[in-house]
UniProtKB/Swiss-Prot annotation:
NCBIfam families: glut_race (TIGR00067), PRK00865.1-1 (NF002034)
Function: Provides the (R)-glutamate required for cell wall biosynthesis.
Pathway: Cell wall biogenesis; peptidoglycan biosynthesis
Primary enzyme class: isomerase
HAMAP family, per database record: Glu_racemase (MF_00258)
Name of the protein: Glutamate racemase
Binding site for substrate: 28-29, 60-61, 93-94, 205-206
Gene field: murI
Pfam families the UniProt entry points to: Asp_Glu_race
A GO term, aspect molecular function: glutamate racemase activity
Source organism of this protein record: Escherichia fergusonii (strain ATCC 35469 / DSM 13698 / CCUG 18766 / IAM 14443 / JCM 21226 / LMG 7866 / NBRC 102419 / NCTC 12128 / CDC 0568-73)
Top-level taxon: Bacteria
């Protein structure tokens, strides 16, 4: 199942500097990557975490591929110049599908991407109908269709691309209520089906943040599947076997690309996730 938001009583795990720990960057265009970070942190609580989100170019789902690749490389480079990294997680499905080759060519540390959890969903479905809920960019990309052909060719795949759901997830973290009517409208093609998907892949890292609302709207018993736990396990393996010795004793920190009022409003949320401060990251280009 998708991960749930932490409640307000979650302790700040890195409130004070401690012994040097491996430094891991988790990056997304927005705050959806916090769902992936949360899975990694639960498995690996004793790391030095950096969360970076690109609130200047958000959302990536509507941007062209060349722009995304250049932008992601610039941001990871800027973080690496401040904190030598043991590993980076691109916690954005859109960015992962286009930028991983460039990142892995440029940097010596491991880079982990996020891909839609098509394979486990194909194993879990009972009625053979799997829904893929993602951004329009992820739904259209050939990489997604290759995953389906490879791992779910015996399933009926129903795809929905939505930029509005990304905005709903961002708004939720800003303290706004999520409109169930808006979700029903987005999901209407599935809700009208005689036999809708019994398993839904959350193919955007923002969407686990809407798990509770999605379960209220989708038919009872619908399974929600995301790749957060698998990314956490992959991160643990790479840190043990392939990551360079890049450590820091600093507190966990979050970076935005522009310190807007909206970004400042996220500080209490980020602190609940264990990040002590939010700073603007200077990015060249």
């Amino acid at each position: 199942m998708a991960t749930k938001l932490q409640d307000g009583n979650t302790p700040c795990l890195a409130a004070t500097p401690s012994e040097p720990r491996p430094t891991v960057l988790v990056f997304d265009s927005g705050v959806g990557g916090l769902s992936v970070y949360d899975e990694i942190r639960h498995l690996l609580p004793d790391l030095h975490y950096i969360y970076a989100f690109d609130n200047v170019a958000f959302p990536y789902g509507e941007k062209n591929e060349d722009f995304i690749v250049e932008r992601v490389v610039e941001i990871v480079t800027a973080v690496q110049e401040r904190y030598p990294l043991a590993l980076a997680v691109v916690a954005c499905n859109t960015a992962s599908t286009v930028s991983l080759p460039a990142l892995r060519e440029k940097f010596a540390f491991p880079v982990v991407g996020v891909v839609p959890a098509i394979k486990p969903a194909a194993r879990l479905t009972a009625n053979g109908i799997v829904g893929l809920l993602a951004t329009r960019g992820t739904v259209k990309r050939s990489y997604t269709h290759e995953l389906i052909a490879r791992f779910a060719n015996e399933c009926q795949i129903e795809m929905l691309g939505s930029a509005e759901m990304v905005e709903l997830a961002e708004a939720k973290l800003h303290g706004e209520d999520v409109s169930l009517d808006a979700l029903k409208r987005i999901l209407r093609p599935w809700l009208r089906m005689k036999e809708p998907p019994d398993t839904v892949v959350l193919g955007c890292t923002h969407f686990p943040l809407l798990q509770e609302e999605l379960l209220q709207v989708l038919p009872e018993g619908t399974r929600l599947v995301d790749s957060g736990a698998a990314i956490a396990r992959r991160t643990a393996w790479l840190l043990e076997h392939e990551a360079p010795d890049a450590k820091s004793a600093d507190a966990n920190i979050a970076f935005c690309m522009d310190m807007t009022p909206e970004a400042e409003q996220l500080l209490p949320v980020l602190q609940r996730y264990g990040f002590k401060t939010l700073e603007k990251l200077a990015v060249s280009g």
